[in-house]
Design a protein with these regions (language model features):
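Metal-dependent phosphohydrolase cores
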Residues: 14, 206
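Glycine-rich beta-strand-to-loop/alpha-helix junction loops that act as flexible
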Residues: 199-203
Length: 245
């Protein structure tokens, strides 16, 4: 899915799902637009939905009953080492191991193990270098830019996609945000070659920056905050309108 996107100079959207309604909305929209899509599941959302097995079963049943024909991946977002194994067992098609908060050597060791496990089972895997700014499931990243040399080392493990910090942030971007570091992204692209790169924190990034990031190798863009805000706004308006529930 992502190799095709990189070759075609476009990016596939990952939209996080937090319940049945979100899952249905994402699947139906992807089908309507005839677009491949990645369903992202954080460990917090997985816990809320009573476990990764429940999520995998719900997605499969909904995919089949809705007659979805576009490519769909079920992907663990910002997974821990333990969470990756749980999702492998639950039937996810793709996992992300976020070891960016570990010392690099520990990140490398755990990534190496999980790449081997994922590929033995025919799953794709995303790894991260350089923590993404903001908070994700209680883990706070400072938003530093990744080291291109470290990115190459992780990419050479055979990961299917690489998330690298380039000044991007989870959640709302502050007014004084300096923007994406395209110099860093270009250097990472030069080091990793055909490796599809991932841009986390897609909400609020201007369209021109998105387009430039895609031109420099980004093939997957994650969106969650924008959906959270839209969902909250629509719910608030519905209740304030005094409609019967």
């Amino acid at each position: 899915m992502l190799e095709k996107a990189k070759a075609g100079k476009y990016a596939v959207g990952q939209f996080n799902i937090n319940n049945l309604e979100w899952t249905k909305a994402v699947l139906l929209t992807a089908q309507e637009l005839q677009s491949p899509v990645i369903l992202g599941v954080s460990e917090g959302a997985g816990k809320y939905m009573t476990g990764f097995e429940t999520v995998a079963a719900m997605v499969k049943a909904m995919h089949d009953s809705l007659g979805i024909t576009v490519p769909v991946a079920l992907h663990l977002d910002h997974g821990t080492y333990e969470g990756c194994y749980k999702c492998v067992k639950a039937g996810f098609t793709s996992i992300m191991f976020d070891g960016s908060h570990y010392p690099f050597e520990e990140n490398l060791a755990k990534s190496t193990e999980l790449v081997n496990v994922a590929h033995q089972l025919g799953l794709s895997i995303e790894c991260e270098v350089g923590s993404i700014g903001g908070e994700e499931d209680g883990v706070i990243g400072m938003g530093e830019c990744a080291d291109p040399e470290e990115c190459k080392i992780i990419a050479d493990l055979g990961v299917d996609m690489l998330a690298a910090g380039i000044g991007n942030i989870h959640g709302k971007y502050p007014a004084n945000w300096k923007g994406l570091s395209f110099e860093t992204l270009d250097a990472i692209q030069q080091k990793t070659g055909t490796m599809p790169l991932v841009l986390h924190g897609g909400t609020g990034i201007p369209a021109d920056m998105i387009k430039k990031a895609i031109s420099l190798g980004v093939s997957k863009i994650n969106v969650n905050t924008e959906c959270q805000l839209s969902f909250a706004d629509a719910t608030r308006k519905y209740i304030e309108a005094g409609k019967d529930l």
